[in-house]
């Protein structure tokens, strides 16, 4: 954790025209209010199978979102869309470090080991509904104002797990996204 200190003016008055009273010393690791933040949205289209998924199946394996910085921040929203119109519900698991001990194989049973729980940001349940005009097949769900903190190593990881039985329309049917805010490095 960084630190900062304020060096105050000691003894004496400020000369006319001076616009500085002391100075601030900031350690490179400090997170300061008003520091530059990065806001953004990342969307990924993982490859899935055009075959039946059942409840508990991982969809698309372990999905990676490469962040622009390695700074910590907030996940602001999480979204899932199916271009072909799947209306199942899904659970989304987010991790701020690679959950290397768990199993993330597309169309296989999702399992997470206890050692990876500390890396998990959260789990979100999403129920997919039509998101476009009548006649368009796209379905999706987003949780906004999520505001879940993360400590980024440069990548946020996601697993999408089916909670029902359905068949995606194509191998590129699913889109996943996050919006985020990251502090200065």
Regions found by a protein language model. Give the residues of each.
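Extended, low-complexity segments enriched in Ser/Thr/Gly and acidic residues that occur primarily
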Residues: 1-62, 67-83, 161, 165-185
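Cysteine-clustered segments with highest specificity for TGF-beta superfamily mature ligands
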Residues: 24, 133-167, 174
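Residue-level detector of short, conserved catalytic/binding motifs and their immediate flanks
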Residues: 73-76, 90, 156
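Surface-exposed turn/loop modules enriched in turn-prone residues
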Residues: 83-123
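Short loop/turn segments at connectors of secondary-structure elements within structured domains
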Residues: 86-89, 152, 170
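Extended, solvent-exposed segments with strong compositional bias
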Residues: 112-148
């Amino acid at each position: 954790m960084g630190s900062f200190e304020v060096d105050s003016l000691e003894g004496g008055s400020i000369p006319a025209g001076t616009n500085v009273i002391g100075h601030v010393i900031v350690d490179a690791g400090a997170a300061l209010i008003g520091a530059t933040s990065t806001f953004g949205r990342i969307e990924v289209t993982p490859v899935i199978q055009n075959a039946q998924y059942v409840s508990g199946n991982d969809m698309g394996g372990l999905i990676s979102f490469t962040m622009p910085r390695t700074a910590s921040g907030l996940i602001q929203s999480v979204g899932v869309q199916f271009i072909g119109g799947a209306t199942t519900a899904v659970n989304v698991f987010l991790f701020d470090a690679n959950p290397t001990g768990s199993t993330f194989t597309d169309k296989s049973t999702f399992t997470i080991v206890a050692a990876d729980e500390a890396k998990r940001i959260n789990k979100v349940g999403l129920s997919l509904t039509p998101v476009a005009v009548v006649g368009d097949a796209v379905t999706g769900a987003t949780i906004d104002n999520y505001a879940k903190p993360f400590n980024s190593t440069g990548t946020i990881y996601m697993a999408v797990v089916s909670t029902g039985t359905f068949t995606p329309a194509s191998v590129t049917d699913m889109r996943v996204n996050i919006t985020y805010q990251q502090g200065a490095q």
